[in-house]
Amino acid sequence: MAFCPLDYRYGCQEFKEIWSELGRHQRQLEVERALVWAHKEMGKVSEEDYGKVAEIAVPSVVTKERVSEIEAETRHDIMALTKAMAEAAGEAGWCIHLGATSNDIVDTAVGLQLRDSIILLRKQLCNLIDVTANLAERERDTVMLGRTHGQAAVPITFGLKVAVWLDEMRRQLIRLDESTPRIAVGKFLGAVGTGAAQGEGARELQRLILTHLGLEVPLATTQVVGRDRYIEYVSWLSNVACTCEKILQEVRNLQRSEIAEAGEGFDVKKQVGSSTMAHKKNPIKSENASGLARIVRSFIIPTYENALLWHERDLANSSSERFTLSHASALCEDVIAKTANVLTNLWVDGERMLANIASQKGLVMAEKVMIELVNHGIGRDESHEILRSASFEAIANGEELIDVCARTPAIAAAFSAEELEAMFDPANHIGVSGEIVDEAVELARNAIQ
């Protein structure tokens, strides 16, 4: 019976395989095999014995079911694993788990899961960056209303809005690449991090194992990998989830009936918005992913708590981390994928954007007129007061600001009717938006090559 929504509703199959019970088991077998391989490289284990261990260190031979049977008696998962391996290896079983402690296996296997997760997350993020770059380029010069405090501000372009998202995504990619060597790490220095059980060659043994597995080698550990590494990983997941939810929240707001400037694609032939309101076209994918992003961020708190281990370690982190790392990873991937889907199928209504600007009766061009007055020789504060008074008069009378400006002595004396008309064209007050879009797109595309 499926219980967790990840089982039947959210997350991709690849992530579920990484963090599944079988995925964990498979990687722990791989770590145990790598340990014996390293001993073989250092002359402590024969080629023949290693060959036998390598042969049985696969889930089809040392099955998860057999390990579970033994664990029911031992009440210790890694001891059950090593017993099952030794059972299958016969005389070669003597060298299995030699010099290791349980968390050498557990944390190194988790390191493999994190490494594999990062590969998938990076792939999804690069796809999202590509989709967003295309959107920014397409809408580079689409003029729309900028809003601050939920109120009409001054014109921007939709391309600039998207470029802001795009550059943030690029920073997230940089953060991931910078942090991966600190996250994809194992450890193999035994019960308290001294390497005493491995002897004088302990550090070389650890180096051989971890480089063989494709993981980074830490300098100093206790019985476990430092949980600051997991904090950094889950913090990155949470950060990316924030980026995605911010985008999706904007889509949801722009799709409001009274704004209607952009929104999710909708299959009018098959899709249903409401069981009773037949006209509805709801931004359900954005809402869905926004909810999942909040769950991702919620895993920050237990991840921080899991770093507070006693002395060289305790076990209070173990049960919690079975949830935090797996669920945060899978859900973040889902959020990124859904955000890419929303932006791929996003509709943008440029005419509606211009209509919404026009609905403000020219008020959003007050800044433009003020700046032109300053350029004409009137002080900034005086220019501001002139436009403030004109704006409030226009609001009070329900007039167009351009009409009030035309009869305001200081403005009428400074500009002709044609010059004033040009000032009230929103496209003439978008600054260097196009340049910013172009550079953001170029940098983003270079980052994902």
Give the predicted meaning of each segment.
Residues 1-189, 195, 203-208, 217, ...:
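A helix-coil-helix interface module used to build multimeric assemblies
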Residues 39, 160, 231-239, 277, ...:
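Short, well-ordered beta-strand elements within core beta-sheets of diverse protein domains
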Residues 102, 199, 216-224, 354, ...:
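A structural signal for small-residue-enriched, beta-sheet-centric alpha/beta enzyme cores
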Residues 124, 150, 154-164, 168, ...:
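Short, contiguous, pocket-lining structural segments
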Residues 137-159, 261-280, 311-320, 344-364:
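Glycine-rich cofactor-pocket loops
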Residues 226-263, 270-329:
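A conserved active-site cap/scaffold subdomain adjacent to cofactor or substrate pockets
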Residues 288, 295-380, 386:
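Long, amphipathic alpha-helical stalk/connector segments used for oligomerization, subunit docking
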Residues 366-414:
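C-terminal hydrophobic structural anchor segments
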